[in-house]
Amino acid sequence: MNMRIIEAVDIRYTYPDGTEALRGINFHAERGEVVALLGPNGAGKSTLFLHFNGILQPTSGKIMIDGEELDYSKSGLIKARQKVGIVFQNPDDQLFAPRVDEDVAFGPLNMGLSEDEVEERVRDALQKVGMLGYESKPPHHFSGGEKKRVAIAGIIAMKPDIMVLDEPTSGLDPRGASQILRLLHNLNEEGMTIIISTHDVDLAPLYSDRIYIISDGEIISTGAPSEVFSDIDTIRGANLRLPRIAHLVEILQKEDDLPFEEPYPLTIGEARRKLRNQLR
């Protein structure tokens, strides 16, 4: 079995106005991984994601899904979008129906499923996102976090192998962000491959198996979180920063002469273990 469930191979994309947004991107996610694409605003994160199920077609290069090149015919795009679901940064760009259940049912209905199967999928999806009981309500009156959960439910109902989320916690308060991240963790535990874009350097190491750094349309670093954040010059050169915990340890080492070894801790748990070792 091919472990690379989705792959971008030398993807280049130029917008009609001549803006070169992607410059030879190579990216992959393995089956069951959580992968974060980390970069500042305008780096090309959203543009790359729109290639993953054929919303955009590359100027050159190819997208591979389950070992097969993405086919841009009507039937090929339907097949790709059943395997790869995309959740936009702004849920208002995704929600359009007057009722929650109608919105969540849109994808399954267009897959040609029976009414009973659609109803079951809608109920299951809403239960997973904690929105069961909201079926008849208008989603456009919801909070940002509730809208995001309905948008995710619409993707869950299609049962894709891969869920791609553009800035999933953007604009949410801490509680709303925590609910979304817990939901994504649960979906991943059930076997779904999760790909997120973010510029939140504190979030990425907490939830990701691997990280890609994108800057000016190019991948400039990839690896496990500890590997990526150990290259401090690359992180700062991409107009990003170290996670707060790592930055604190960097200051303690350089300005207070505390003997921390690199790589710096990226989470509170890692920092606690290192501090306990220092105090023994």
Swiss-Prot record:
ABC transporter domain spans which residues? 6-241
In the UniProt record, does the keyword Nucleotide-binding occur? Answer: yes
Give an example GO cellular component term for this record. Answer: ATP-binding cassette (ABC) transporter complex
* GO BP term (any one): cobalt ion transport
Task performed by this protein: Probably part of an ABC transporter complex. Responsible for energy coupling to the transport system.
User: Mind telling me which NCBIfam families this protein's record contains?
Assistant: cbiO
Name of protein: Putative ABC transporter ATP-binding protein MTH_133
Organism for this UniProt entry: Methanothermobacter thermautotrophicus (strain ATCC 29096 / DSM 1053 / JCM 10044 / NBRC 100330 / Delta H)
Source lineage? Archaea, Methanobacteriati, Methanobacteriota, Methanomada group, Methanobacteria
